[in-house]
Amino acid sequence: MNLVTGATGHIGNVLVKELCARGEGVRALLLPGEGRLPLEGLDIQVVEGNVLDSKALRRAMAGVEVVYHLAGLISILPGTDALVERVNVVGTQNVVQASMEAGVRRLVYTSSIHAIKRVPGEIVIDESIPFDPVGIGSAYDSSKAIATIEVLEAVEKGLDAVVVCPTGVIGPYDYRRSEMGQLIFDTAKARVQFSVDGAYDFVDVRDVAKGLILACQRGRTGEHYILSGERITISTLMATIREHVGL
């Protein structure tokens, strides 16, 4: 049985779909009263709980072999954010502790490329660059770095865990519309008539889901893996969208 936290999120619901397609048993952890549209039609178990509730996590992990921890809050705003830090750091600490108590076979934690130390533009980012909870900008960035370090420190205490760090995730089933998903939608609807300089490494959400499963199956305990796609300029991305919708 696989427990997926953050199961209705963009990566989470695609991961659940991929696990189901492979015949894997899935238990999805949802917030109380959370909408289930992203998981509609899937043969899964649903339990309600919160990563800030240790008792709920222990109940959710009963009989679970693998935990995919994706639950968290995303913010692109600079500065501190107490709720982001609490959910992403304390929530992950709780998941780690519950995983160790439940004796799960493996924890797969979804971190972020933004948790990795910033380097000059000419340097290629790879897994040799450390996580940096201090020198990076937003509350989200630092919270993901701190949470990742918590997971890796738990490995030294006996937890079997691996970490994945996706880059810019795009693709289908973006029910809540991420920042990039909203930009893509607005561009397709001709609501955005301008472009901006710059580029980013984008990765298909379906590849991320498969990467998570590969990390579970083949990843080495205590290692982290960057899930990357292709560097695309924003202007190229927007031009491609306009071309496909006939604008």
Question: What feature does the model see in each segment?
Answer:
Residues 131-135, 182-207:
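A conserved pocket-lining segment of Rossmann-fold NAD(P)-dependent short-chain dehydrogenase/reductase
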Residues 2-22:
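N-terminal Rossmann NAD(P)H-binding glycine-rich loop of SDR-like oxidoreductase domains
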Residues 111, 149-172:
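Conserved beta-loop-beta element that borders a ligand/cofactor-binding pocket
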Residues 171-182, 215-225:
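Glycine/proline-rich active-site loop of Rossmann-fold NAD(P)-dependent oxidoreductases
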Residues 34-40, 44-90, 98:
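NAD(P)H-binding glycine-rich loop region in Rossmannoid oxidoreductase-like domains
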Residues 211-247:
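Mid/C-terminal beta-alpha module of Rossmann-like enzyme folds, strongest
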Residues 90-140:
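Conserved Rossmann-fold NAD(P)-dependent oxidoreductase catalytic core, especially the SDR/UDP-sugar
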